[in-house]
């Protein structure tokens, strides 16, 4: 009944991944991002992650895999997803939704920390404001974006962009794979 739809969805996902893999710059960017994160941890820094909707879930998943575990037991790494409901509702109410991430970065971000900002469109105003706040604090910035990078293009130290112009879920599928690879590489770097 739905076999053709299922095949089409899986084929489109495979095609999106194949297109991402064709550009060696993506592979190098992932490696550089992992080393940057591990270097921050080794120097006593932390990573803050943020995004909206599914990207918010990815930001939380990233932090959870770092503080908890990925595939093997190891020490936890300092990672915080900006997802505290009381913070988000307070700042959203008192300042506005566009400030929910930047206020948190202003409060706990430090020089030497890293911000991971995730936006499939690259146009999330609250993530863009978080990037600006991170810069003010002397933090490094890594972004996971899609399409043409949107307004977030060229705002990060390292941008990992999925150049897919269809539905956002295809971009998110690559983002979560990148997140898992980042964690795997961070674990390797941390034992060097």
From Swiss-Prot:
Record GO cellular component, one term: cytoplasm
UniProt pathway annotation: Carbohydrate biosynthesis; D-glycero-D-manno-heptose 7-phosphate biosynthesis; D-glycero-alpha-D-manno-heptose 7-phosphate and D-glycero-beta-D-manno-heptose 7-phosphate from sedoheptulose 7-phosphate: step 1/1
UniProt entry keywords in alphabetical sequence: Carbohydrate metabolism, Cytoplasm, Isomerase, Metal-binding, Zinc
Record keyword Metal-binding present: yes
Needed cofactors: Zn(2+)
Binding site for substrate: 52-54, 65, 93-94, 119-121, 124, 172
Highest taxon in the source lineage: Bacteria
Every SIS domain range: 37-192
Positions bound to Zn(2+): 61, 65, 172, 180
EC number from the UniProt entry: 5.3.1.28
Swiss-Prot/TrEMBL catalytic activity: 2 D-sedoheptulose 7-phosphate = D-glycero-alpha-D-manno-heptose 7-phosphate + D-glycero-beta-D-manno-heptose 7-phosphate
Subcellular location field: Cytoplasm
CC cofactor note: Binds 1 zinc ion per subunit.
Note: The reaction produces a racemic mixture of D-glycero-alpha-D-manno-heptose 7-phosphate and D-glycero-beta-D-manno-heptose 7-phosphate.
PANTHER family: PHOSPHOHEPTOSE ISOMERASE, SEDOHEPTULOSE 7-PHOSPHATE ISOMERASE / DNAA INITIATOR-ASSOCIATING FACTOR FOR REPLICATION INITIATION
Stated role: Catalyzes the isomerization of sedoheptulose 7-phosphate in D-glycero-D-manno-heptose 7-phosphate.
Family statement drawn from the similarity comment of this UniProt entry: Belongs to the SIS family. GmhA subfamily.
Name by which UniProt lists this protein: Phosphoheptose isomerase
Gene from which the chain derives: gmhA
């Amino acid at each position: 009944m739905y076999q053709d739809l299922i095949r089409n969805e899986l084929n489109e996902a495979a095609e999106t991944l194949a297109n991402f893999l064709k550009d060696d710059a993506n592979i190098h960017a992932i490696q550089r991002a992992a080393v940057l994160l591990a270097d921050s941890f080794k120097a006593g820094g932390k990573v803050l992650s943020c995004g909206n909707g599914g990207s918010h879930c990815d930001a939380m998943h990233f932090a959870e895999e770092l503080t908890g575990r990925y595939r093997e037991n190891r020490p936890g790494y300092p990672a915080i997803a900006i997802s505290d409901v009381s913070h988000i509702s307070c700042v959203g109410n008192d300042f506005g939704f566009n400030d929910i991430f930047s206020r948190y970065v202003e409060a706990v971000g430090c020089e030497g920390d890293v911000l991971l900002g995730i936006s499939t469109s690259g146009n999330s105003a609250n993530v863009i404001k978080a990037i600006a706040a991170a810069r003010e604090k002397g933090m490094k910035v890594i972004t996971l974006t899609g399409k043409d990078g949107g307004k977030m293009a060229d705002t990060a130290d390292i941008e990992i962009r999925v150049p897919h112009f269809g539905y956002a879920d295809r971009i998110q599928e690559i983002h979560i794979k990148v997140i898992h690879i980042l964690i795997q590489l961070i674990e390797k770097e941390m034992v060097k």
